[in-house]
Swiss-Prot record:
Keyword Phosphoprotein applies: no
Top-level division of the source organism's lineage: Bacteria
E.C. no: 2.7.1.51
GO terms of biological process kind: L-fucose catabolic process
Recorded metabolic or biological pathway in which this protein acts: Carbohydrate degradation; L-fucose degradation; L-lactaldehyde and glycerone phosphate from L-fucose: step 2/3
Family from the record: Belongs to the FGGY kinase family.
Protein name: L-fuculokinase
Name of the gene this protein is made from: fucK
Cofactors that this protein relies on: a divalent metal cation
Gene Ontology MF annotations: ATP binding; L-fuculokinase activity
Length: 472
Protein backbone atom coordinates (compact mmCIF):
# COMPACT_ATOMS: atom_id res chain seq x y z
CA UNK A 1 0.00 0.00 0.00
CA UNK A 2 1.37 3.42 -0.97
CA UNK A 3 2.45 5.80 1.78
CA UNK A 4 0.17 8.84 2.02
CA UNK A 5 1.80 12.29 2.05
CA UNK A 6 1.10 16.00 1.85
CA UNK A 7 3.36 17.76 -0.67
CA UNK A 8 4.50 21.17 0.59
CA UNK A 9 5.73 23.61 -2.06
CA UNK A 10 7.78 26.17 -0.14
CA UNK A 11 8.98 29.32 -1.89
CA UNK A 12 11.64 30.98 0.26
CA UNK A 13 13.75 34.01 -0.56
CA UNK A 14 16.88 31.89 -1.06
CA UNK A 15 15.51 28.43 -1.89
CA UNK A 16 12.47 26.85 -3.53
CA UNK A 17 11.63 23.41 -2.13
CA UNK A 18 9.25 20.50 -2.62
CA UNK A 19 8.90 18.36 0.50
CA UNK A 20 6.63 15.36 1.04
CA UNK A 21 5.48 14.85 4.65
CA UNK A 22 3.65 11.84 6.09
CA UNK A 23 0.91 11.79 8.74
CA UNK A 24 3.44 11.65 11.58
CA UNK A 25 5.22 14.78 10.34
CA UNK A 26 8.19 12.80 8.99
CA UNK A 27 9.80 13.97 5.75
CA UNK A 28 9.55 11.25 3.10
CA UNK A 29 11.19 13.11 0.21
CA UNK A 30 12.71 16.52 -0.35
CA UNK A 31 14.34 18.58 -3.07
CA UNK A 32 15.64 22.13 -3.10
CA UNK A 33 16.92 24.55 -5.69
CA UNK A 34 18.23 28.13 -5.27
CA UNK A 35 15.80 31.02 -5.65
CA UNK A 36 16.79 34.54 -6.67
CA UNK A 37 15.07 37.75 -7.63
CA UNK A 38 15.81 39.54 -10.91
CA UNK A 39 16.96 43.08 -11.60
CA UNK A 40 14.13 45.19 -13.03
CA UNK A 41 14.46 46.47 -16.60
CA UNK A 42 13.37 49.99 -15.56
CA UNK A 43 16.03 50.51 -12.90
CA UNK A 44 19.06 48.38 -12.03
CA UNK A 45 18.62 49.00 -8.28
CA UNK A 46 15.09 47.54 -8.31
CA UNK A 47 14.28 43.88 -7.60
CA UNK A 48 11.43 41.73 -8.90
CA UNK A 49 10.44 38.05 -8.97
CA UNK A 50 9.69 35.97 -12.04
CA UNK A 51 6.60 33.83 -11.37
CA UNK A 52 7.45 31.58 -14.32
CA UNK A 53 10.96 31.02 -12.94
CA UNK A 54 9.58 30.15 -9.48
CA UNK A 55 7.11 27.67 -11.00
CA UNK A 56 9.90 26.13 -13.07
CA UNK A 57 11.96 25.74 -9.88
CA UNK A 58 9.03 23.93 -8.26
CA UNK A 59 8.81 21.70 -11.35
CA UNK A 60 12.55 20.94 -11.11
CA UNK A 61 12.17 20.01 -7.42
CA UNK A 62 9.15 17.77 -8.06
CA UNK A 63 11.01 15.98 -10.84
CA UNK A 64 14.07 15.48 -8.58
CA UNK A 65 11.89 13.48 -6.16
CA UNK A 66 9.63 11.97 -8.81
CA UNK A 67 10.74 8.39 -8.10
CA UNK A 68 9.89 8.79 -4.38
CA UNK A 69 6.60 10.54 -5.16
CA UNK A 70 5.46 7.76 -7.50
CA UNK A 71 5.69 5.42 -4.49
CA UNK A 72 3.38 7.75 -2.54
CA UNK A 73 -0.27 8.71 -2.63
CA UNK A 74 -0.23 12.54 -2.58
CA UNK A 75 -3.34 13.46 -0.58
CA UNK A 76 -2.92 17.21 -0.93
CA UNK A 77 -0.64 20.11 -1.86
CA UNK A 78 0.03 23.18 0.33
CA UNK A 79 1.98 26.28 -0.74
CA UNK A 80 4.01 28.45 1.67
CA UNK A 81 5.92 31.61 0.77
CA UNK A 82 7.48 34.73 2.30
CA UNK A 83 4.96 37.50 2.97
CA UNK A 84 3.89 40.83 1.42
CA UNK A 85 4.82 40.30 -2.26
CA UNK A 86 2.27 39.85 -5.03
CA UNK A 87 1.04 41.25 -8.34
CA UNK A 88 -1.90 42.72 -10.24
CA UNK A 89 -3.42 40.23 -12.68
CA UNK A 90 -6.06 40.21 -15.43
CA UNK A 91 -9.11 37.90 -15.64
CA UNK A 92 -6.93 35.04 -16.91
CA UNK A 93 -4.46 35.48 -14.04
CA UNK A 94 -1.74 36.95 -16.28
CA UNK A 95 0.56 39.43 -14.56
CA UNK A 96 -0.03 43.07 -15.53
CA UNK A 97 3.23 44.13 -13.85
CA UNK A 98 6.14 42.09 -12.39
CA UNK A 99 6.11 40.98 -8.74
CA UNK A 100 7.94 43.72 -6.82
CA UNK A 101 10.35 42.01 -4.39
CA UNK A 102 10.39 42.74 -0.66
CA UNK A 103 14.04 43.80 -1.08
CA UNK A 104 13.24 46.45 -3.72
CA UNK A 105 13.98 50.00 -2.50
CA UNK A 106 11.37 51.72 -4.71
CA UNK A 107 8.68 51.65 -2.01
CA UNK A 108 10.78 53.30 0.75
CA UNK A 109 9.71 56.79 -0.36
CA UNK A 110 6.04 55.73 -0.26
CA UNK A 111 6.45 54.64 3.37
CA UNK A 112 8.23 57.88 4.26
CA UNK A 113 5.35 59.91 2.81
CA UNK A 114 2.39 57.77 3.92
CA UNK A 115 1.37 60.39 6.51
CA UNK A 116 -0.17 62.49 3.72
CA UNK A 117 -2.75 59.71 3.27
CA UNK A 118 -3.11 58.20 6.76
CA UNK A 119 -1.07 58.50 9.97
CA UNK A 120 1.50 55.74 10.47
CA UNK A 121 0.28 55.30 14.05
CA UNK A 122 -3.34 54.82 12.91
CA UNK A 123 -2.17 52.43 10.20
CA UNK A 124 -0.47 50.16 12.72
CA UNK A 125 -3.33 50.43 15.24
CA UNK A 126 -5.75 49.11 12.58
CA UNK A 127 -3.55 46.63 10.70
CA UNK A 128 -1.09 45.57 13.41
CA UNK A 129 1.72 45.55 10.86
CA UNK A 130 4.77 47.73 11.53
CA UNK A 131 6.24 50.34 9.20
CA UNK A 132 8.42 48.22 6.91
CA UNK A 133 9.15 49.59 3.43
CA UNK A 134 8.33 46.23 1.80
CA UNK A 135 4.69 46.20 3.00
CA UNK A 136 2.09 45.34 0.35
CA UNK A 137 0.23 48.60 0.95
CA UNK A 138 3.26 50.64 -0.18
CA UNK A 139 3.59 48.52 -3.33
CA UNK A 140 -0.04 49.17 -4.28
CA UNK A 141 0.27 52.90 -3.55
CA UNK A 142 3.44 52.95 -5.71
CA UNK A 143 1.58 51.19 -8.55
CA UNK A 144 -1.38 53.58 -8.17
CA UNK A 145 0.91 56.62 -8.39
CA UNK A 146 3.16 55.31 -11.16
CA UNK A 147 0.87 53.03 -13.20
CA UNK A 148 -2.72 54.11 -12.37
CA UNK A 149 -4.09 52.50 -15.53
CA UNK A 150 -2.99 49.07 -14.28
CA UNK A 151 -5.12 49.34 -11.14
CA UNK A 152 -8.12 50.22 -13.29
CA UNK A 153 -7.48 47.29 -15.67
CA UNK A 154 -6.66 44.75 -12.97
CA UNK A 155 -9.06 41.94 -12.19
CA UNK A 156 -7.30 41.17 -8.90
CA UNK A 157 -4.27 41.54 -6.66
CA UNK A 158 -2.86 38.11 -5.82
CA UNK A 159 -0.25 37.55 -3.13
CA UNK A 160 2.62 35.33 -4.23
CA UNK A 161 1.17 32.19 -2.60
CA UNK A 162 -2.14 32.88 -4.35
CA UNK A 163 -0.38 33.47 -7.68
CA UNK A 164 1.10 29.97 -7.33
CA UNK A 165 -2.25 28.53 -6.18
CA UNK A 166 -3.97 30.15 -9.18
CA UNK A 167 -1.48 28.48 -11.54
CA UNK A 168 -2.18 25.16 -9.81
CA UNK A 169 -5.99 25.38 -9.64
CA UNK A 170 -7.24 28.28 -11.78
CA UNK A 171 -8.91 29.75 -8.65
CA UNK A 172 -8.59 33.39 -7.53
CA UNK A 173 -8.17 33.47 -3.74
CA UNK A 174 -6.44 35.38 -0.95
CA UNK A 175 -4.61 33.38 1.74
CA UNK A 176 -5.63 35.04 5.01
CA UNK A 177 -2.13 34.59 6.48
CA UNK A 178 -0.65 36.52 3.54
CA UNK A 179 -3.25 39.28 3.82
CA UNK A 180 -2.21 39.56 7.47
CA UNK A 181 1.24 40.78 6.36
CA UNK A 182 -0.11 43.41 3.96
CA UNK A 183 -0.81 46.36 6.30
CA UNK A 184 -4.26 46.57 4.69
CA UNK A 185 -6.34 44.43 7.06
CA UNK A 186 -8.37 45.46 10.04
CA UNK A 187 -6.67 42.82 12.13
CA UNK A 188 -9.45 42.67 14.74
CA UNK A 189 -12.09 42.09 12.02
CA UNK A 190 -9.90 39.65 10.04
CA UNK A 191 -10.85 41.46 6.82
CA UNK A 192 -9.58 44.30 4.64
CA UNK A 193 -9.92 47.69 6.33
CA UNK A 194 -12.35 50.09 4.61
CA UNK A 195 -10.57 52.96 6.39
CA UNK A 196 -7.09 52.05 5.07
CA UNK A 197 -8.33 51.26 1.55
CA UNK A 198 -10.38 54.47 1.37
CA UNK A 199 -7.51 56.65 2.64
CA UNK A 200 -5.06 55.18 0.10
CA UNK A 201 -7.49 54.85 -2.81
CA UNK A 202 -7.05 51.07 -3.19
CA UNK A 203 -10.31 49.42 -4.39
CA UNK A 204 -11.64 46.49 -2.29
CA UNK A 205 -12.70 44.68 -5.48
CA UNK A 206 -9.02 43.81 -6.14
CA UNK A 207 -8.93 41.21 -3.36
CA UNK A 208 -10.58 37.83 -4.10
CA UNK A 209 -12.23 35.67 -1.45
CA UNK A 210 -10.26 35.17 1.73
CA UNK A 211 -9.42 31.55 2.50
CA UNK A 212 -8.45 30.27 5.93
CA UNK A 213 -5.46 27.97 6.40
CA UNK A 214 -6.59 24.39 5.86
CA UNK A 215 -9.41 25.37 3.50
CA UNK A 216 -9.47 23.68 0.08
CA UNK A 217 -8.78 26.14 -2.76
CA UNK A 218 -9.35 23.76 -5.67
CA UNK A 219 -7.69 20.81 -7.37
CA UNK A 220 -4.55 20.45 -9.47
CA UNK A 221 -5.38 21.22 -13.10
CA UNK A 222 -4.01 19.51 -16.23
CA UNK A 223 -1.36 22.06 -17.26
CA UNK A 224 0.08 22.43 -13.73
CA UNK A 225 0.02 18.65 -13.21
CA UNK A 226 1.95 18.14 -16.45
CA UNK A 227 4.50 20.80 -15.49
CA UNK A 228 5.09 19.31 -12.01
CA UNK A 229 4.87 15.70 -13.17
CA UNK A 230 2.03 14.97 -10.72
CA UNK A 231 -1.41 13.37 -11.10
CA UNK A 232 -4.34 15.63 -12.00
CA UNK A 233 -6.97 16.36 -9.35
CA UNK A 234 -4.88 16.52 -6.16
CA UNK A 235 -6.62 18.86 -3.64
CA UNK A 236 -4.76 22.15 -3.11
CA UNK A 237 -5.09 23.36 0.50
CA UNK A 238 -4.55 26.96 1.64
CA UNK A 239 -1.43 27.68 3.69
CA UNK A 240 0.38 30.96 2.91
CA UNK A 241 2.83 32.99 4.99
CA UNK A 242 5.77 30.90 6.22
CA UNK A 243 6.07 32.57 9.66
CA UNK A 244 2.63 31.46 10.85
CA UNK A 245 3.25 27.85 9.86
CA UNK A 246 6.70 27.89 11.46
CA UNK A 247 5.07 28.89 14.77
CA UNK A 248 2.48 26.12 14.54
CA UNK A 249 4.97 23.58 13.19
CA UNK A 250 7.39 24.29 16.06
CA UNK A 251 4.73 23.06 18.47
CA UNK A 252 3.99 26.51 19.94
CA UNK A 253 0.90 26.58 22.15
CA UNK A 254 -1.20 29.66 22.84
CA UNK A 255 0.70 32.25 24.96
CA UNK A 256 3.99 30.35 24.50
CA UNK A 257 6.46 32.83 22.99
CA UNK A 258 8.76 31.60 20.23
CA UNK A 259 12.18 33.09 19.52
CA UNK A 260 13.64 32.47 16.08
CA UNK A 261 17.32 33.22 16.61
CA UNK A 262 19.60 34.00 13.70
CA UNK A 263 21.26 37.11 12.24
CA UNK A 264 18.07 38.76 13.48
CA UNK A 265 16.04 37.54 16.42
CA UNK A 266 12.28 37.47 15.87
CA UNK A 267 10.12 37.06 18.97
CA UNK A 268 6.47 36.14 18.39
CA UNK A 269 3.57 34.64 20.28
CA UNK A 270 0.17 33.12 19.47
CA UNK A 271 -2.19 35.19 21.62
CA UNK A 272 -5.97 35.54 21.86
CA UNK A 273 -5.72 39.28 22.53
CA UNK A 274 -3.55 42.08 21.19
CA UNK A 275 -3.42 45.77 22.02
CA UNK A 276 -2.48 47.17 18.62
CA UNK A 277 -2.56 50.76 19.92
CA UNK A 278 0.65 49.98 21.87
CA UNK A 279 2.55 48.61 18.87
CA UNK A 280 3.68 51.89 17.32
CA UNK A 281 5.46 52.80 20.58
CA UNK A 282 7.97 50.01 19.97
CA UNK A 283 10.35 50.12 17.00
CA UNK A 284 10.48 46.83 15.13
CA UNK A 285 7.10 45.67 16.43
CA UNK A 286 4.42 44.09 14.27
CA UNK A 287 1.33 41.92 14.52
CA UNK A 288 0.11 39.39 11.96
CA UNK A 289 -2.85 37.03 11.90
CA UNK A 290 -2.25 33.55 13.28
CA UNK A 291 -2.87 30.50 11.12
CA UNK A 292 -5.97 29.87 13.25
CA UNK A 293 -8.97 32.20 13.47
CA UNK A 294 -9.25 34.04 16.79
CA UNK A 295 -5.49 34.20 17.41
CA UNK A 296 -2.92 36.90 16.65
CA UNK A 297 0.87 36.87 16.24
CA UNK A 298 2.33 40.03 17.79
CA UNK A 299 6.09 40.17 17.56
CA UNK A 300 9.28 42.18 17.45
CA UNK A 301 12.64 41.83 15.78
CA UNK A 302 16.17 43.10 16.36
CA UNK A 303 19.73 42.44 15.17
CA UNK A 304 21.22 39.56 17.19
CA UNK A 305 23.79 37.11 15.75
CA UNK A 306 24.65 39.91 13.32
CA UNK A 307 26.16 41.68 16.36
CA UNK A 308 28.02 38.52 17.43
CA UNK A 309 29.40 38.07 13.91
CA UNK A 310 30.74 41.65 14.07
CA UNK A 311 32.37 40.96 17.48
CA UNK A 312 33.96 37.76 16.14
CA UNK A 313 35.42 39.60 13.16
CA UNK A 314 36.69 42.39 15.43
CA UNK A 315 38.55 40.23 18.00
CA UNK A 316 39.05 36.91 16.20
CA UNK A 317 38.49 36.27 12.48
CA UNK A 318 35.33 35.72 10.45
CA UNK A 319 36.34 32.03 10.18
CA UNK A 320 37.12 31.37 13.87
CA UNK A 321 34.94 28.48 15.13
CA UNK A 322 32.18 29.77 17.43
CA UNK A 323 33.13 27.17 20.03
CA UNK A 324 36.42 29.00 20.66
CA UNK A 325 34.53 32.22 21.50
CA UNK A 326 32.06 30.32 23.66
CA UNK A 327 34.81 28.59 25.67
CA UNK A 328 36.60 31.91 26.33
CA UNK A 329 33.34 33.56 27.45
CA UNK A 330 32.40 30.55 29.61
CA UNK A 331 35.50 31.15 31.78
CA UNK A 332 34.18 34.61 32.73
CA UNK A 333 31.65 35.02 35.54
CA UNK A 334 28.12 36.28 34.83
CA UNK A 335 28.21 40.07 34.65
CA UNK A 336 31.48 39.95 32.66
CA UNK A 337 33.36 41.68 35.52
CA UNK A 338 31.37 44.88 34.99
CA UNK A 339 31.75 45.06 31.20
CA UNK A 340 28.39 45.88 29.61
CA UNK A 341 27.39 46.22 25.96
CA UNK A 342 24.65 48.28 24.34
CA UNK A 343 23.99 46.06 21.32
CA UNK A 344 21.84 48.24 19.05
CA UNK A 345 24.53 48.81 16.41
CA UNK A 346 22.00 49.92 13.78
CA UNK A 347 20.37 52.94 15.39
CA UNK A 348 21.81 53.79 18.82
CA UNK A 349 24.59 56.39 19.14
CA UNK A 350 25.59 54.90 22.51
CA UNK A 351 26.11 51.38 21.15
CA UNK A 352 29.27 49.66 22.34
CA UNK A 353 30.96 48.63 25.60
CA UNK A 354 31.22 50.27 29.03
CA UNK A 355 33.19 49.26 32.10
CA UNK A 356 36.32 48.24 30.20
CA UNK A 357 39.57 48.00 32.22
CA UNK A 358 43.15 46.93 31.59
CA UNK A 359 42.12 43.43 32.69
CA UNK A 360 39.37 43.13 30.08
CA UNK A 361 39.91 40.34 27.55
CA UNK A 362 38.21 39.61 24.25
CA UNK A 363 36.23 36.93 26.11
CA UNK A 364 34.75 39.73 28.24
CA UNK A 365 33.68 41.61 25.12
CA UNK A 366 31.96 38.53 23.71
CA UNK A 367 30.31 37.60 27.03
CA UNK A 368 29.08 41.20 27.41
CA UNK A 369 27.59 40.99 23.90
CA UNK A 370 25.72 37.77 24.80
CA UNK A 371 24.43 39.36 28.01
CA UNK A 372 23.55 42.64 26.27
CA UNK A 373 21.54 40.84 23.59
CA UNK A 374 19.79 38.81 26.29
CA UNK A 375 18.89 42.01 28.17
CA UNK A 376 17.39 43.27 24.91
CA UNK A 377 15.40 40.03 24.62
CA UNK A 378 14.22 40.45 28.22
CA UNK A 379 12.94 44.00 27.53
CA UNK A 380 11.25 42.89 24.32
CA UNK A 381 9.58 39.91 25.99
CA UNK A 382 8.20 42.22 28.69
CA UNK A 383 6.83 44.53 25.96
CA UNK A 384 5.33 41.57 24.09
CA UNK A 385 3.63 40.33 27.27
CA UNK A 386 2.03 43.75 27.62
CA UNK A 387 0.94 43.91 23.95
CA UNK A 388 -0.38 40.32 23.87
CA UNK A 389 -1.87 40.20 27.40
CA UNK A 390 -0.01 37.05 28.50
CA UNK A 391 2.69 35.96 30.93
CA UNK A 392 5.42 33.67 29.59
CA UNK A 393 6.16 30.53 31.59
CA UNK A 394 8.76 29.25 29.10
CA UNK A 395 10.40 30.28 25.82
CA UNK A 396 10.54 28.07 22.72
CA UNK A 397 13.75 28.60 20.75
CA UNK A 398 14.40 27.74 17.09
CA UNK A 399 17.02 28.75 14.52
CA UNK A 400 20.80 28.77 14.22
CA UNK A 401 21.38 30.87 17.35
CA UNK A 402 19.91 28.06 19.46
CA UNK A 403 23.08 26.01 18.87
CA UNK A 404 24.99 28.36 21.20
CA UNK A 405 24.54 26.52 24.52
CA UNK A 406 26.19 29.28 26.61
CA UNK A 407 23.84 31.91 25.16
CA UNK A 408 20.87 29.59 25.81
CA UNK A 409 21.85 29.27 29.46
CA UNK A 410 22.35 33.02 29.83
CA UNK A 411 18.85 33.51 28.40
CA UNK A 412 17.30 31.01 30.83
CA UNK A 413 19.09 32.66 33.77
CA UNK A 414 18.24 36.26 32.86
CA UNK A 415 14.63 35.57 31.84
CA UNK A 416 14.20 33.24 34.84
CA UNK A 417 12.07 30.81 32.82
CA UNK A 418 12.94 27.50 31.14
CA UNK A 419 14.10 27.52 27.51
CA UNK A 420 12.88 24.77 25.15
CA UNK A 421 15.16 24.29 22.15
CA UNK A 422 13.81 22.59 19.03
CA UNK A 423 16.57 21.46 16.70
CA UNK A 424 14.27 20.51 13.81
CA UNK A 425 14.76 23.16 11.13
CA UNK A 426 11.69 22.27 9.08
CA UNK A 427 9.05 23.99 11.20
CA UNK A 428 7.39 25.88 8.31
CA UNK A 429 7.01 22.73 6.23
CA UNK A 430 5.75 20.76 9.24
CA UNK A 431 3.14 23.42 10.01
CA UNK A 432 1.89 23.63 6.43
CA UNK A 433 1.68 19.83 6.18
CA UNK A 434 -0.38 19.66 9.38
CA UNK A 435 -2.91 22.11 7.94
CA UNK A 436 -2.81 20.07 4.73
CA UNK A 437 -3.74 16.88 6.60
CA UNK A 438 -6.55 18.72 8.35
CA UNK A 439 -7.68 20.22 5.03
CA UNK A 440 -8.04 16.84 3.30
CA UNK A 441 -10.18 15.57 6.18
CA UNK A 442 -7.64 13.26 7.80
CA UNK A 443 -7.99 15.03 11.17
CA UNK A 444 -10.72 17.09 12.82
CA UNK A 445 -8.39 19.99 13.59
CA UNK A 446 -4.80 21.11 12.95
CA UNK A 447 -4.10 20.43 16.66
CA UNK A 448 -5.26 16.84 16.29
CA UNK A 449 -2.87 16.51 13.33
CA UNK A 450 -0.06 18.03 15.41
CA UNK A 451 -0.67 15.56 18.25
CA UNK A 452 0.73 12.83 15.94
CA UNK A 453 4.17 14.49 16.01
CA UNK A 454 6.72 13.50 18.63
CA UNK A 455 8.62 16.70 19.43
CA UNK A 456 12.06 16.42 20.99
CA UNK A 457 13.20 19.47 22.94
CA UNK A 458 16.40 20.26 24.82
CA UNK A 459 15.69 22.16 28.04
CA UNK A 460 17.76 24.90 29.70
CA UNK A 461 16.63 25.79 33.22
CA UNK A 462 17.46 28.96 35.19
CA UNK A 463 20.39 28.28 37.52
CA UNK A 464 23.00 30.02 39.60
CA UNK A 465 25.61 27.28 39.24
CA UNK A 466 28.29 27.48 36.51
CA UNK A 467 26.82 26.76 33.08
CA UNK A 468 25.65 23.17 32.94
CA UNK A 469 23.46 21.83 30.17
CA UNK A 470 20.72 19.33 30.88
CA UNK A 471 19.58 17.54 27.75
CA UNK A 472 16.15 15.94 27.55
Amino acid sequence: MKQEVILVLDCGATNVRAIAVNRQGKIVARASTPNASDIAMENNTWHQWSLDAILQRFADCCRQINSELTECHIRGIAVTTFGVDGALVDKQGNLLYPIISWKCPRTAAVMDNIERLISAQRLQAISGVGAFSFNTLYKLVWLKENHPQLLERAHAWLFISSLINHRLTGEFTTDITMAGTSQMLDIQQRDFSPQILQATGIPRRLFPRLVEAGEQIGTLQNSAAAMLGLPVGIPVISAGHDTQFALFGAGAEQNEPVLSSGTWEILMVRSAQVDTSLLSQYAGSTCELDSQAGLYNPGMQWLASGVLEWVRKLFWTAETPWQMLIEEARLIAPGADGVKMQCDLLSCQNAGWQGVTLNTTRGHFYRAALEGLTAQLQRNLQMLEKIGHFKASELLLVGGGSRNTLWNQIKANMLDIPLKVLDDAETTVAGAALFGWYGVGEFNSPEEARAQIHYQFRYFYPQTEPEFIEEV
